[in-house]
Amino acid sequence: MHSFQIFSDGACDLTLEAQNAYQISTVPFYVSFDGKTYLKELKELTLDHFYHHLIEEKGFPKTSLPSVHDFVEAFTPALEAGKDILSLHITHTLSGSMQSALTAKLMLEEEFPNAKIHIVDSHNATGSQALLLMEAARMQQEGKSLEEVVSYLEQAKKDTRIIFMIGSLTHLQRGGRIGKIAALSSNILKIKPIIVLRDGEIHVGGATRSRKKGIAELVKLTAEHFQKSGENPADYIAMVGTTDVTEEIAPTEALLKAELPQLELVSPLQIGATISSHTGPGTTGICIAKRYECYSL
């Protein structure tokens, strides 16, 4: 059985330390503050620098997806070492990253005809994409085959969720993610929109006037997922993700533990530049994914 290397685009928001621990290689997105100079997230641009610009300078960063060349450059050393490749990507509804990787795959298959290169749409982003990667890495470490890991990802992405609250719709509206009327109404009413990313699509989860109530609503919607689906919380792992409002991590985790004590919480995650360029500051979310042992592979 060939060994394989796990890749992801940078939208998974795994830290460099986590990438090393899980032996996951990422291909970063690019971020620009002036529309001219683009820097690779984490590798050329720290999150501290990014959030300073986003919050203190009230900037509107732009992002650019990894190029075909970026994926070819990332995949080639693994293929030359005789490894197969599994690459997990942000949902295609939010980015064309997966298409870049698919084009790279077609090019590389000519040079490495015996290699297996699997490009998978996670239907998710940021923390929920990270949870799928963490389970994939655990499977790899426990000796599961490439095909078993791909089977898990294709099944689990349908059960994976991220439910998040954002400070306002200003950044989403500026990026063309929502209609102007929705953005205007939100800003006038000073509400905090709650959004659910499910099956690769963005759904409105509600709205609240305070962040404290918003956190409670995030937990409520997470609990409702289990109530409506009949799923067992003990079969899932979860994490809290946030942009700049790290003080919300502890109260969110506390409410989540009280409401769903069987749900295993892993270390929280800081949402990176790729996603927060669109959501803006003041974003907090709950991510859940089902363990691989719960599926027939």
Annotate each language-model stretch with its function.
Residues 2-6, 264:
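Short active-site oxyanion
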Residues 4, 83-87, 236-238:
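Generic beta-sheet signal
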Residues 5-65:
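N-terminal glycine-rich anion-binding loop in soluble enzyme alpha/beta folds
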Residues 11-19, 24-25, 30, 93, ...:
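Mixed-charge interfacial surface used for oligomerization/domain docking
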Residues 56-94, 99, 103, 150:
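Glycine-rich phosphate- or other oxyanion-binding loops that anchor nucleotides, phosphorylated ligands
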